[in-house]
From Swiss-Prot:
Substrate binds at G41, N42, R43, R44, W45, S85, T86, E87, R92, R211, R217, I218, S219. PANTHER family: DEHYDRODOLICHYL DIPHOSPHATE SYNTHASE COMPLEX SUBUNIT DHDDS, DEHYDRODOLICHYL DIPHOSPHATE SYNTHASE FAMILY MEMBER. Mg(2+) binds at D40, E230. This is Tritrans,polycis-undecaprenyl-diphosphate synthase (geranylgeranyl-diphosphate specific). Its EC number is 2.5.1.89. Its cofactor is Mg(2+). The keyword Iron-sulfur does not apply. Keywords: Magnesium, Metal-binding, Transferase. Belongs to the UPP synthase family. InterPro entries: UPP_synth-like, UPP_synth-like_CS, UPP_synth-like_sf. The active site is at D40, N88 (proton acceptor). It comes from the Archaea.
Amino acid sequence: MAKDLTRGLLFKPIYKLYELVLWNQIRNGPLPDHVGIIPDGNRRWARDNNLSLNDAYFYGYKKLKEVLIWLLELGIKNITVFVLSTENCDKRKQNELSIITTYIKRGIQDLLEDPIVDKYEVKVSAIGKLDKLPKDLIDYLNRVVEKTSNYDKRKLTLAICYGGRQEILDAVVRLLDDYRNGKIVKSEINEETFRKYFYDSELQDIDLVIRTSGEVRISNFLLWHVAYSELFFCEAYWPEFRKIDLWRAIRSFQKRKRNFGA
């Protein structure tokens, strides 16, 4: 225990120095306008540390609060978080889903009460098959969406019970309904008009996707919006994600030449 404490005391100033070095590297560079977060690895982190399932999502919830502050302070205007996929919504055991939704609700309560939302004028929205969520959670979501509806400086989008394929399918169905009802003609159908049928028609394309836990995939996350995203995969599990990991992701983004498919 004493050895671990000594090691921590020794590494802390080195960590802070490295954080400062990274900050000096990125502070004057271009920032992504829209950052997408896939916070993966809560359960594996808990298992490796002999912690409970509840601990896994508690520390994941705490980390998300911390990272959102980092992103807002950095100046990121649009943030989308992959909170819960449709696959997990449908396949996870009920006791685990209960824990997950408990901390989602706690996070929504924080958004209702935290002055940082008002300070940065963060507009909050939620996308996905929200009808699958518990009614009390839906009520909290509606409250925070309504409370922040007039803010326009920043935007936080929560993807809950969300799947990229399902969103595109739902958009196609709505488009076909409008076509059958004469509300749109074939010549008017293009990328711009198609976007209007998504869950959030105002959601911008994502510039940078950050995924934790070492998994190198996007897992059905906003498939349309990540078509030209830069991807950054971090080895750390989500509860271990540090500010230097975020700075590294930003530095990586700044070093890339974006061709948008050209």
